[in-house]
C-alpha cells in the first residue's frame, strides 16, 4: 500500500474518538469507530489534544512512555463523554516529571478544577488527582479569549450554543488552520455570523453533525446539529474541508456511508470522521497538496 507521509512540519489531525454521548459497539460500527470525542492535533512536533472522551485512552496507549513532558488537553466542556478518558490516560500513570495541563472555559462561572477533582475521587474513581504520578494543572478562561502558551503557540476560542455552554477552538500552524467545533446547535439564523467569522477560511472544520435532519426535529434543544448545517456553515464561510464528528452512536457504518455520499454530492471535500483517520496539511509556503488519508486507508490500526 502506497500513501503520502506528512512532513515533520505539517499541521496534522488524527481522530481517536468520533462518537457523541456514548460509545458504540458491535461489528456494524467498525469503520467509523466506537469511542467518544478525542482529537490529536500536531503542529509539527507540538502536540495538542482536543477533548478527553474514551478515545483518550487509546491515544495514551499509543503515546506511552514517549509522551511529551508537557501535554496540553483542551476541553470543549465537561459533559461526561468529553472527559471520561482522563482517568485512563496512560501518560498520567507514567513518569513523575510529566505535567498534564487541562484548559476549559469557565462556562457557568465555575472552574473545571472542582468537577475534575470530583471525577478523580471515590466513589467515582479510586485514585485522586494528587495521587497520580503525573502532575495535573488546570487553566480556566472565558470563551472568546485566546489561549497563549509558554512556547508562543496561540489557540483562539469561541463560545458555542450548547446546554451549559461549550468552547470551539481554532489552531494555526505555518499558514494552515483547523477549527474544532464540537457540541454546537445551529441557530435559527444560520450560518451564525460570529461562528462563520471564527471558522472563515480554515483548512479543516471539525463539526458536530450528530443527528440527521429528520432526527433533529425530535432533538431540538439538545445542543447538537446536522451534517447539512455543517455544510451550510462551511460553504458560507469559505471552509476548505469539513469533517463531520460527534456521531450518533446509533448510526452504523452503512447509514454513515450513505450520509457521507449524500453530503459529498453537495460538498466534495466534506467527509465523516473515522477513528484513527489522519488528515495532514503541509505548510502553506510549500507547493504540496494537503495529504489526507482516504477513508479506505484510515481503518483502525493504520498509523
Tell me the role of every PLM-derived stretch.
Residues 187-276:
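Cap/insert and terminal regions of metallo-dependent hydrolase folds
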Residues 302-303:
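ATP-dependent carboxylate-amine ligase
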Residues 50, 76, 181-182, 207-209, ...:
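Active-site flanking residues adjacent to catalytic metal/cofactor-binding acidic residues
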Amino acid at each position: 500500500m502506497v500513501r503520502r507521509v506528512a512532513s515533520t512540519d505539517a499541521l496534522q489531525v488524527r481522530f481517536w474518538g468520533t462518537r457523541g454521548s456514548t460509545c458504540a459497539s458491535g461489528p456494524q460500527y467498525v469503520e467509523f469507530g466506537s469511542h467518544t470525542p478525542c482529537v490529536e492535533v500536531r503542529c509539527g512536533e507540538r502536540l495538542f489534544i482536543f477533548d478527553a472522551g474514551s478515545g483518550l485512552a487509546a491515544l495514551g496507549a499509543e503515546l506511552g512512555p514517549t509522551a511529551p513532558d508537557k501535554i496540553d488537553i483542551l476541553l470543549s466542556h465537561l459533559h461526561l463523554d468529553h472527559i471520561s478518558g482522563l482517568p485512563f490516560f496512560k501518560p498520567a500513570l507514567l513518569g513523575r516529571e510529566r505535567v498534564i495541563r487541562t484548559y476549559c472555559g469557565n462556562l457557568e462561572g465555575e472552574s473545571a478544577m472542582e468537577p475534575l477533582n470530583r471525577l478523580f475521587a471515590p466513589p467515582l474513581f479510586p485514585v485522586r488527582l494528587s495521587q497520580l504520578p503525573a502532575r495535573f494543572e488546570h487553566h480556566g478562561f472565558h470563551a472568546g479569549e485566546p489561549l497563549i502558551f509558554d512556547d508562543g503557540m496561540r489557540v483562539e476560542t469561541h463560545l458555542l450554543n450548547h446546554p451549559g455552554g461549550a468552547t470551539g477552538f481554532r489552531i494555526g500552524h505555518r499558514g494552515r488552520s483547523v477549527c474544532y467545533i464540537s457540541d454546537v446547535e445551529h441557530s435559527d439564523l444560520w450560518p451564525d455570523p460570529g461562528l462563520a467569522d471564527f471558522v472563515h477560511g480554515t483548512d479543516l472544520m471539525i463539526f458536530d453533525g450528530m443527528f440527521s435532519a429528520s432526527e433533529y426535529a425530535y432533538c431540538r434543544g439538545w445542543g447538537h446539529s446536522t451534517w447539512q448545517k455543517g455544510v451550510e456553515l462551511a460553504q458560507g464561510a469559505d471552509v476548505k474541508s469539513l469533517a463531520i464528528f460527534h456521531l450518533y452512536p446509533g448510526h452504523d457504518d452503512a447509514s454513515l456511508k450513505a450520509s457521507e455520499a449524500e453530503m459529498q454530492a453537495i460538498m466534495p471535500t466534506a467527509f465523516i470522521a473515522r477513528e484513527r483517520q489522519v488528515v495532514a496539511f503541509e505548510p502553506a509556503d510549500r507547493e504540496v497538496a494537503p495529504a489526507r488519508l482516504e477513508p479506505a486507508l484510515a481503518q483502525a490500526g493504520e498509523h
